[in-house]
Amino acid sequence: MSIKYVATSKLPTPWGVFAMHGFEDTETGKEHVALTFGTLNSDAPVLGRIHSECLTGDALFSLRCDCGFQLQTAMQNIAETGSGFILYLRQEGRGIGLLNKIRAYELQDKGANTVEANEQLGFPADMRKYDMIQPMLEQIGVKHVRLMTNNPRKVKAMKEIGIEVVERVPLQVGKNRYNEAYLKTKSTELGHMMSEYHFTDEE
């Protein structure tokens, strides 16, 4: 994989001014983003998140998932901490793309869970890859991470590329009546480490 750094700009947000670093995968044409806040110390653990694109949750306020809640909470946590990063990866629908995600939602509306819907469309439950994160983290100067995630695959991916995950920080927010079954499936079938007692209900 060939990841090329492109440019950096300021990104004012409700939680403060982040820096937005643009990257291009020259093999696939996909464009990824790293957000950084404050001064990142390469010798100390940095609070961060690897976030896969979710148009419906991040931008359209969907209650079918917890993605938008996780992104906003991660940005708020980073701002309150004073420094940190988010890698925003263009892997919509756990890697199957937006239109296939809508097809999967249609199957879920008919009774399939999130894993079954992917499989009925001929896809694995999770097609995401994380090999692009190494050059992105190298560019922003991060070697040791306090990773905000419930997904053990992300912890494993970081360790495999030589990034030390000092701590896994749970990010359990956004549970509501529309996504309760989805979150349960992520826990029971995809191995996400979640406890219903830590969710913040959003009705």
Curated annotation (Swiss-Prot):
GO-annotated cellular components: cytosol
Assigned EC number: 3.5.4.25
Co-factor: note: Binds 1 zinc ion per subunit.
GO biological process: riboflavin biosynthetic process
Reactions it catalyzes: GTP + 4 H2O = 2,5-diamino-6-hydroxy-4-(5-phosphoribosylamino)-pyrimidine + formate + 2 phosphate + 3 H(+)
GO molecular function, one term: GTP cyclohydrolase II activity
Cofactor: Zn(2+)
Residues reported in the UniProt entry to bind Zn(2+): C54, C65, C67
Keywords: GTP-binding, Hydrolase, Metal-binding, Nucleotide-binding, Riboflavin biosynthesis, Zinc
Listed pathway(s): Cofactor biosynthesis; riboflavin biosynthesis; 5-amino-6-(D-ribitylamino)uracil from GTP: step 1/4
Domain of life per record: Bacteria
Binding-site residues for GTP, renumbered to this chain: R49, I50, H51, S52, E53, Q70, E92, G93, R94, T114, T149, K154
SUPFAM superfamilies in UniProt: RibA-like
Disulphide bridges: none
Job description of the protein: Catalyzes the conversion of GTP to 2,5-diamino-6-ribosylamino-4(3H)-pyrimidinone 5'-phosphate (DARP), formate and pyrophosphate.
Family classification: Belongs to the GTP cyclohydrolase II family.
Protein's name in the database: GTP cyclohydrolase-2
Source organism: Shewanella sp. (strain MR-7)
